[in-house]
Amino acid sequence: MINQISIKNQMLSLVLLFTWIANAQEPVDYVNPLVGTDSKPSMSNGNTYPAIAMPWGMNFWTPQTGKMGDGWAYTYAADKLRGFKQTHQPSPWMNDYGQFAIMPLTGKLRFTEDDRASWFSHKSEIVKPYYYSVYLADHDITTEITPTERAAMFRFTFPENEHSQIVLDALDKGSYVKIIPDERKIIGYTTKNSGGVPDNFKNYFVMVFDKDFETTKTFSGEQLLEGLEIETDHAGGIVGFKTKRGEVVIAKVASSFISYDQAELNLRELGNDDFNTIKEKGRASWNKELGRIKVEGGNVDQFRTFYSCLYRSLLFPRKFFEYDVNGKVVHYSPYNGKVLPGYMFTDTGFWDTFRALFPFLNLMYPELNSQIQEGLANAYKEGGWLPEWGSPGLRNVMVGNNSASVVADAYLKNGETNTYDIATLYEALIHGANNAGPLTAVGRAGVDYYNKIGYVPYDVGINENAARTLEYAYDDFTIYQLAKALNKPKKEINLYKKRSLNYKNLFDPETKLMRGKNENGEFMAPFNPFKWGDAFTEGNSWHYTWSVFHDIQGLADLMGGNEAFANKLDEVFSLPPIFDESYYGGVIHEIREMQVANMGQYAHGNQPIQHMPYLYNFAGQAWKTQYWVRETMDRMYTAEPDGYCGDEDNGQTSAWYVFSALGFYPVCPGTDQYVLGTPLFQKTTLILEDGKEISINAPKNSTSNKYVNALTINGKVHSKNWLSHKELIQGAILNFDMTGTPNKTRGTNSEDFPFSLSNEK
């Protein structure tokens, strides 16, 4: 008995020790940058690459398994690396711009991307947000990278070899390389891009070594050349030296979209620090931002998934500005090609990110979001339009006019502290809402129809017309909200309120679903609610019917009341995952991801329906929200390379998880409200920018105890199915009483439901 007690005590001590060790880890230690990299064009488990970067950094770095120009720059299943790429890629579908690659090698000179490629193993790979290391087996070289916002330091550990080399590949589409041996330096530029750039676009780079060059070469495409300078379609440079076994060579790299001189200035970010110091500074930067949210009382897998999602939420939009010789903020404009003062951000698609990412930044990083808003004002002044998908300039992708949501939500939640030009931004919103742009994804395609008859018709040659109508109506609501806050004329306010009800024009009373409508007022026929595309964007009617973020009560009324509405929500999950792909001529990856998820018509891998599980709160059935949100978190997310259920999309799908883990979600950006879900952890602490804290306590939380029995805020019973942003940012203590049995009486009264325009007084 004594021995048994002793053994039990020892085991308990070990458990406590391991728990302490786990809890002692810092937030960045839980991050896995490889989440989402096990992807391909036909099946996205994230479509990410390991971004070795600072939060919102101007430049990212990634190991490169894909070929030059391949949007799938790094795929987990690959077994060879072709180089280490400076990248600005937001998505494989958008591809990259301003990229160039670096690759060390030994022995016979092999500079083309296939010849220089080396086998590698994930077993000899270390991947952190602030640090990357890998062993290149074919060259017997260990390569390490640690970044700053605009620069990076490489550490190469070579074997003994007479012919150790480093290749700098400036890639094709117009590039230049110059080797300067006396300065141990390579400079150059790349113009490679995927669109959305002015004619004078260049990314200027400088690379400085700590070792003299013994050999130098340049190349043009596959042709090796003598000489130190080359300007051609596809330029590159090679420097070589003898190395001893274990010899370390350091290279410092920086770049600029402005000039060579600015690239040299950007090297200042590295200063005189050694590699390990830069690495530790990077680690500290990530811990500072990730540490703004502290989670306790979950398992290690949940910690890893949470912080990996939080990491992805802190990468985009990227900083597209630099600091001049006087420390002033300047930027190269991707809209007019000029160098101008002020902030600029890019690489985000508002169709994705207005939903959760930007509301998350408004809550946790409002100062950064104020800079982003200034950047949007600059974008409008420089290009005449707000970017709906910027990478780096205007790109013709997706639908909607969702810059309105991004601008309005930022001002409405943090307007009292804003220092940016809201007057210019409001002007930009009005301009975008009433004009078709130079691209169909800018301004509003079909705006004349929409403003005249209240919808974009199905039969006038404008694709995805129902999706456009629904998104325009919501965007008009956000303009209405902003117009009220800015005390605009009553006539103007009422105009956008009226337009925000245009969603009703597409509601089909027969099917109780949204449906494309012809110019003559008749619904399009035949109608297949399972048909993807056509009247909708990357989805079908079962997905887009819920895109009435601002007036869920109005939608419920159209369906016949709250019970009928809740039953329709139930159908999304109970229907089989059938589909009609005929619009696309084949099964696109978003369809396949819905099909394999086994959640009916719920397609969490794509954005239009991600808010839908929270809508039960508007019908007095909050427990169903709690069930389906937890199901989605548990089944659709992991911290592994296949950890997403579709494209991660620049922080949006990650921000959904982060918000949901907190226990609430911004169903309707442009209002003050977050709709309640179910917290994931037993304790979460949000440290706001001004030092105030939001404490979220759910001590009985567990896998089975996922239902909210009761909630108090600052000691007062809270029966409502929503939280106020204004109340939260004052500092708040939320105490959730969790249970394994649904509480079907809490939040059932209409006065407890979240905001709907139809209920506005």
Q: Model features per residue range: what roles?
A:
Residues 694-702:
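Short aromatic-glycine motifs in intrinsically disordered, low-complexity regions
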